Amino acid sequence: MSADYPTFKEALEKFKNLESDTAGKDKFNWVFTLENIKSAADVNLASKGLVQLYALQEIDKKINNLTTQVSKLPTTSGSSSAGAIVPAGSNTQGQYKAPPKKGIKRKYPA
């Protein structure tokens, strides 16, 4: 019957391994443990830190999503498509002509 359940030492090792895996996957190097939480102020501080960590992770996900969207934008590879981004310093002459200044009449306040 005892073979169905792990011993205390086996369970302890498993949880230690899980904790080290979590620490290894922690991207922001913020691993929260409940060791030193004794007062209500500690609880508030830890919950504030967890909220900040959650917000940072959400921001990181959004940045990753934006990065994938930006990398999918079309590039100008010889074709002059309407939505393409023009690289800096490229020749854009002939695409837009400013109106002649002779025909513009400005009214200046007296």
Curated annotation (Swiss-Prot):
It comes from the Viruses. The lineage of its organism: Viruses, Riboviria, Pararnavirae, Artverviricota, Revtraviricetes. Residues 72-82 have a biased composition (Polar residues). Residues 72-110 are annotated as: Disordered. This is Protein P2. Residues 99-110 have a biased composition (Basic residues). InterPro entries: RTBV_P12. It holds the Pfam family RTBV_P12.
